[in-house]
Amino acid sequence: MILIDDIKYACMECVRGHRSSSCKHHERPLLQVRSKGRPGVYANGNPNHRVAIFAEEIAKSDKPSTNGTKRCKSEPIIVLKASSKQVIDCSSGVIIGPYDETKTKPSTVEKRTPSPPIISDESFINTSACCTPKISKGKSCGCCNNKRKAVNKSKILQNYIKNKLNQKINNNETLVFMNKSHTTNNEQKEDHQLYGMVPVPSCSIPGTCCCDDACSCQGCVVHGNSKYQIPLPTSKQQVTDTTNPFENEEKFIFNSMPQTDKSDLFFNTISTSSNVPPADSSSECSCPPNACDCTNCETHGILNGFRLDDYFKDQSKLMNVLDFNFSELLGTIPEQPIPTEFMQPPSENTLLTSLSSENSFIPNQTKELSTQPPILPLDAQNVCNELDQLEPLVPSLQPCDKKATKWVNNRDTLEDVSDNRVKSCCSKKTK
């Protein structure tokens, strides 16, 4: 082993043969033995360049050696006085020049320091729940929060239509459906009679009085109270004035809703007869107007998940709300006003059914416009029934073409289903 200034050196051959500890070749160029691992610094930045020195003399020891041969074999340590450091090329053995430590460059293959982790150590520390901000739940309305609560769908539809009608009245918007003039036998009719709800006082219809035997209602038909007699119409003008609540409307079927308190009578009657528990009016919906998620919302007019505004875009649907069908929401209904000749006054049974029905929320004045097929006159139906009874008796006679076309098309005009045409068909068959 060769030590120079307490640094281990060996010749090039011993370094390559991994015999640096037993090297004694001091007459050769001696290379500095590096520590294990990759070198941190290269001489002149070149991996083939190594720092080398040349031995000049052997330093003499002060004490004489005893058993020198045995000691050298066991501990072959030689201390030399070397020359200055030189740079030698290991591949060729050529001395490049003196070694300059300032020109030494660090190794490019030096291990890089590991980058800090993306997730810091503090993120794994458990924090207290009181320090972390809590997510505050937004305010929800009563109809969205409590799903088990019974919803009064009748009240939702009732308030929606009532608000729509009041809005139309306040904005002075009128809806006009003009009657088309129909001629029979090339003659123009002078007047078109309109049939609607007769404004009769309460308790004048059988089944509407809820009093006991001591009833004191004026004109009560149920308990036979005759203190008040309802005047009956005696002239054609009085009948027209009674059946037509819209006076001086110039032959319009519907012009505008009258601003009277009679329309509130049906809303009060329905609200008292309904068996559905009333909804909580104190809890108002806090959803945005255009993004309400409620299934049944009275504030925004939503019924069974459908917006009533989308259904009642057509004004004829709003007027025909008595025929409201929940299973056919957002459906299309033909917009065609019905001629006044096919409109008949409602009977008492029909009026009672509309009052007791759960889905009837609008005064019967709005039922003047109906999209159902037109109803034939009663006398025309009777005559046609008689014709059907005569067919088995006279098999040779063929039915009239006018009768066949009359029953195929339900939307024929009055000319095809008039009394005169039907009676003429009867006279032909009986001859």
UniProtKB/Swiss-Prot annotation:
SMART domains: Copper-fist, Cu_FIST
Annotated compartments: Nucleus
GO molecular function: copper ion binding; DNA-binding transcription activator activity; DNA-binding transcription factor activity; DNA-binding transcription factor activity, RNA polymerase II-specific; RNA polymerase II cis-regulatory region sequence-specific DNA binding
One annotated GO biological process: alternative respiration
Keyword Transcription regulation: yes
Annotation: DNA-binding region: 1-40
Principal subcellular localization: nucleus
Pfam family, one: Copper-fist
PROSITE patterns referenced in this protein's UniProt entry, alphabetically: COPPER_FIST_2 (PS50073)
Entry binding sites for Zn(2+): C11, C14, C23, H25
The keyword Transcription belongs to this UniProt entry's keyword annotation: yes
Disulfide bonds: none
Domain of life: Eukaryota
Inducing factors: Expression is inhibited in the presence of copper. Expression is increased in polymicrobial biofilms during coinfection with S.aureus.
Keywords: Activator, Copper, DNA-binding, Metal-binding, Nucleus, Transcription, Transcription regulation, Zinc
InterPro entries: Copper_Homeo_Regul, Cu_fist_DNA-bd_dom, Cu_fist_DNA-bd_dom_sf
Role: Copper ion-sensing transcription factor which activates transcription of the CTR1 copper transporter under low-copper conditions. Promotes filamentous and invasive growth.
Name of this protein: Metal-binding activator 1
Source organism per UniProt: Candida albicans (strain SC5314 / ATCC MYA-2876)
